[in-house]
Amino acid sequence: MDSVKTRSTMKAVVYFVALMLGSAWSDMAGECDMAGFYMELGCTPLPRPDNSTACPDAFQCPDLHPDPSMCYYRGVPYGDRSTIPQALINNPCSQACRCTVAGEPRFECAALDCVEVFNGDLQQCVRTYELESCCSTGNVCGKDAIASLKTCEVDGKTYMEGESFEPKNSHKTCICTGEWNGTTDNAAYCRDINCGIEIHYQEKLLDNCAPVFVGDRRRCPIGFTCPSATTRVVRGLNVRGVNSECVFGNRTLSVGDEVTADACTTCACDVPPFVSCMMKNPCPNST
């Protein structure tokens, strides 16, 4: 039991250090594949052999489950039916998250039904958001009212005051305001994206499954894929000479190795220690 407590304390320290690194981590998350994913899990980048400042080849992660009978969030263990204090959750879409230990431990959260999900486009209206809200908080309707709003030019697109957007090459979500100046380091209108990986995919992490991404691996994963009876590892060539390895289920892979998934998804050991997958969108073989 003491060893479990020690590992939990060490993991919490890792999370504290990651938080102290602040903007440097955030910049890396927006520019480097898998960095945001690993940052959220409290992992740290391993130094490159050439000591360059290029994107990390691999990360070192704390033990995500020192005790497999507990849920873990940001290094803190939660027993069955324990709830994460809302002030500790950095994702406004994750509310009232409680640990459930039935089989493998996992978190269950309250379902949030945003009106924009059920009522998509509003004619002559702009949906407005607040930085710490999950759903839209209001509407601005009518030509004159909309014309009076400030605008933000971001990545070739125009956003109206109150609209949310995610700038390219960043791991941030922002709200268009009159103070927007093209930078994302102002906490008044931008915050780091938190994918809620430990909250929504607790059991997948425990089983050493692989995150699945669409578009690029600098955004949040859309899910995980896990080993199955038909999983096959195709050995590749480690052209970068990375010594770190990936773990997929109970299998160990070298950088360059690939894992068979399905016709729409390709998985590989690229940035250890997790295998990562890319899903085609759209998939030509989907029905």
Which functions belong to the PLM regions below?
Residues 2-287:
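Extracellular secretome segments
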